[in-house]
C-alpha cells in the first residue's frame, strides 16, 4: 500500500479512485491532481514508481487534507458557536442549519426521540 498524506492508499484501485481515500480529496480534485502530475487516471496505485509517488505526494501536499482540514472545519464551527450567530446557535442546539423543517423530520440531526414523561 502506498502511503500518501498519512493514509494507506489501496494498491489495487485506479489512481483516480484511490486518491479519494484521503479526506478532503474527491473525484474532481483527484482528477485535477492527476492531470497536473501527468499520471493517467486508469493507472493502478500499485503500478506507480517511487519517483511518481513522490510527485503525487508533493501535489497532494499543496492542498489542505486529512487532519489539518478536519481541524480547520471544527475550528470554523467553534468560531460560529462563539460568535453566537444563527448558524452557531443551530450547531450548539444540534438542529439543522439551512432552513429545513424541524416540527417533523430532522431525526438524524436531533438524535433519537426523547420519551414524554407523565
From Swiss-Prot:
InterPro entries: Rbsml_uS13_C, Ribosomal_uS13, Ribosomal_uS13-like_H2TH, Ribosomal_uS13_bac-type, Ribosomal_uS13_CS. One of its GO terms (cellular component) is small ribosomal subunit. SUPFAM superfamilies: S13-like H2TH domain (SSF46946). Disulfide bonds: none annotated. Pfam families: Ribosomal_S13. It comes from the Bacteria. GO terms for biological process: translation. Keywords: Ribonucleoprotein, Ribosomal protein, RNA-binding, rRNA-binding, tRNA-binding. The keyword Cytoplasm does not apply. Transmembrane segments: none annotated. Residues 94-118 are annotated as: Disordered. GO terms for molecular function: rRNA binding; structural constituent of ribosome; tRNA binding. Belongs to the universal ribosomal protein uS13 family. Part of the 30S ribosomal subunit. Forms a loose heterodimer with protein S19. Forms two bridges to the 50S subunit in the 70S ribosome. Located at the top of the head of the 30S subunit, it contacts several helices of the 16S rRNA. In the 70S ribosome it contacts the 23S rRNA (bridge B1a) and protein L5 of the 50S subunit (bridge B1b), connecting the 2 subunits; these bridges are implicated in subunit movement. Contacts the tRNAs in the A and P-sites. This is Small ribosomal subunit protein uS13. It comes from Pseudoalteromonas translucida (strain TAC 125).
Amino acid at each position: 500500500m502506498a502511503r500518501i498524506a498519512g493514509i494507506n492508499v489501496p494498491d489495487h484501485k485506479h489512481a483516480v479512485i484511490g486518491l479519494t481515500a484521503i479526506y478532503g480529496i474527491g473525484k474532481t480534485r483527484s482528477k485535477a491532481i492527476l492531470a497536473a502530475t501527468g499520471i493517467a487516471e486508469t493507472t493502478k496505485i500499485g503500478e506507480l514508481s517511487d519517483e511518481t509517488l513522490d510527485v503525487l505526494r508533493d501535489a497532494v501536499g499543496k492542498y489542505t487534507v486529512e487532519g489539518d482540514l478536519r481541524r480547520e472545519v471544527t475550528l470554523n464551527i467553534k468560531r460560529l458557536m462563539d460568535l453566537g450567530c444563527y448558524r452557531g446557535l443551530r450547531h450548539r442546539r444540534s438542529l439543522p442549519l439551512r432552513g429545513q423543517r424541524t416540527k417533523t423530520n430532522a431525526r438524524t440531526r436531533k438524535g433519537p426521540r426523547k420519551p414524554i414523561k407523565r
